[in-house]
């Protein structure tokens, strides 16, 4: 059935929501593990004579606007076209672009396949996709097949194992470079910790923990007022809601797994050289009961609220353990339905020491006092990554503490110099596959499931490439 946003959103208001689900099958593990078939691709040159890189954007919500800030904040870029089916975000984005005193881009809107017209009509050096999750793969695949040399896709890049293979196969077949826009990999403390890992301070890597631990209850029932904790807001999800609540909440209704793993696993994967001398071998996942979203609805709207009748399938806390080829283990947690402060819960541990994000702790054997934590800030000042020390002033003006700017700068550097992307199709697939695999494992009572080798054996010889 055609994957349309309209059909997806209609599920939200249907009686007895929750029966749909996004199935994960064994066929996903094997049937798609074949080299991508030749794809028809328009050959479009990278860069015009004026030296400006040509960008297109699909999806014009708040993430798009932050990306536009950084694209236009870096010299040598222009926006050719933008696309969205909703007028409101388009108008906001056009006003946002106008602040930069640059030509207005061409606008594509109307039908849900309008992005295909944009891709076929315009020439781009890069297209950035910041749409609802279920559209990431169809749009990225369409962009690569249309001959766009570089495609940036927001997180998570894919929802199922099949979709992960689609990204890999089409990227390989077309030669287009896919980059997953995982901004946390560029967080300042994360990059400093990565440098410490690479310089051997923690010894041989043994274990990592991470997760997306973020109270999203207001995000999932957002009417545009309630999200900001103002009085008078209403619980909203589905077509009448605001921003992500239009589509994101439905994933909590129909799915049960780690549906948003990349903020945590991306940085840990870089520390473990995943896809570059190491790889994920297997995964097992378990989910708790689901209580948080129902309780939130009852607390805010009463026991008779229509949403109180919805069965939210997503366990409040989903815990996954991954085994790596080189022996390491990783624990990944998804926790978005309960009251809590934000944390990605990083722990990077080796034979000589570790970093723990919560508490800002570092311990290095032989340099730290025995059995006493050091403040991580003291270490991170010494091991600040060169991207941050070079771009700090510009980055501080950007979103998410500057990591969005650093990420876009690194991506644009690859585009302009026609290099492989910092976080490629194999990273996008391996990190995002946790979603589909965790759903499979939970459905089987926590059974161990094998991780596909999206590199088809290349991981043995591939060298680390991120933020060298």
UniProtKB/Swiss-Prot annotation:
Residues annotated as signal peptide: 1-30
Domain of life: Bacteria
Cofactor mode of binding and number, as noted: Binds 1 NAD(+) per subunit. The NAD(+) cannot dissociate.
Residues binding NAD(+), per UniProt: 62-63, 84, 133-136, 154-155, 183, 243-247, 260
Post-translational modification: Predicted to be exported by the Tat system. The position of the signal peptide cleavage has not been experimentally proven.
UniProt GO MF annotations: alpha-N-acetylgalactosaminidase activity; nucleotide binding
Residues that coordinate or bind substrate: 212, 248, 260-263, 342
Enzyme Commission number(s) of this protein: 3.2.1.49
UniProt KW keywords: Glycosidase, Hydrolase, NAD, Signal
Cofactor dependence: NAD(+)
Name of the top EC class for this enzyme: hydrolase
Catalytically driven reaction(s): Cleavage of non-reducing alpha-(1->3)-N-acetylgalactosamine residues from human blood group A and AB mucin glycoproteins, Forssman hapten and blood group A lacto series glycolipids
Pfam families named in the record: GFO_IDH_MocA, Glyco_hydro_109_C
Entry's family note: Belongs to the Gfo/Idh/MocA family. Glycosyl hydrolase 109 subfamily.
Function statement: Glycosidase that has specific alpha-N-acetylgalactosaminidase activity.
Protein name: Alpha-N-acetylgalactosaminidase
């Amino acid at each position: 059935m055609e994957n349309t946003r309209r059909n997806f959103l209609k599920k939200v208001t249907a009686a007895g929501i929750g029966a749909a689900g996004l199935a994960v099958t064994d066929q996903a593990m094997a049937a798609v593990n074949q080299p991508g078939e030749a794809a028809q691709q328009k050959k479009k040159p990278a860069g015009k004579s004026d030296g400006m890189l040509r960008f297109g954007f699909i999806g014009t919500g708040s993430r798009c606007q932050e990306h536009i800030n950084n694209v236009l904040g870096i010299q040598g870029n222009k926006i050719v076209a933008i696309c969205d089916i909703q007028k409101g975000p388009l108008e906001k984005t056009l006003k946002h672009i106008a602040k930069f005193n640059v030509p207005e881009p061409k606008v594509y809107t109307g039908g849900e396949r309008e992005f295909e017209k944009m891709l076929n009509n315009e020439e781009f050096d890069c297209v950035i996709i910041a749409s609802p999750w279920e559209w990431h793969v169809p749009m990225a695949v369409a962009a690569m097949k249309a001959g766009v040399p570089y495609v940036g896709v927001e997180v998570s890049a894919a929802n199922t194992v099949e979709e992960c293979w689609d990204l890999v196969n089409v990227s390989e077949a077309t030669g287009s470079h896919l980059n997953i826009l995982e901004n946390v990999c560029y967080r300042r403390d994360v990059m400093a910790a990565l440098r410490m890992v690479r310089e051997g301070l923690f010894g041989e890597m043994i274990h990592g923990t991470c997760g997306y631990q973020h109270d999203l209850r207001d995000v999932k029932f957002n009417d545009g007022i309630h999200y900001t904790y103002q009085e008078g807001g209403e619980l909203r999800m589905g077509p009448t809601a605001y921003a992500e609540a239009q589509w994101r909440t439905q994933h909590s209704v129909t799915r049960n797994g780690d549906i948003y793993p990349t903020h945590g696993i991306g940085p840990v994967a870089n520390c473990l050289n995943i896809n570059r001398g190491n790889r994920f071998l297997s995964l097992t996942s378990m989910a708790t009961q689901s209580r948080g979203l129902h309780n939130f609805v009852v607390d805010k709207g009463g026991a008779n609220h229509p949403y109180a009748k919805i069965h939210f399938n997503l366990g409040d806390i989903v815990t996954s353990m991954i085994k790596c080829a080189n022996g390491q283990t990783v624990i990944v947690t998804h926790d978005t339905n309960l009251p809590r402060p934000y944390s990605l819960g990083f722990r990077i541990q080796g034979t000589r020491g570790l970093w723990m994000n919560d508490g800002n702790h570092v311990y290095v054997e032989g340099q730290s006092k025995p059995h006493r934590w050091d403040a991580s800030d003291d270490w991170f000042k010494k091991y600040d990554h060169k991207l941050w020390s070079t771009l700090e002033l510009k980055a501080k003006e950007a979103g998410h503490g500057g990591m969005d700017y650093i990420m876009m700068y690194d991506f644009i550097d690859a585009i302009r110099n026609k290099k492989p992307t910092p976080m490629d199709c194999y990273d996008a697939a391996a990190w995002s596959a946790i979603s589909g695999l965790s759903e499979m494992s939970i459905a089987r009572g926590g059974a161990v499931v094998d991780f596909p080798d999206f590199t088809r054996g290349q991981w043995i010889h591939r060298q680390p490439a991120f933020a060298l």
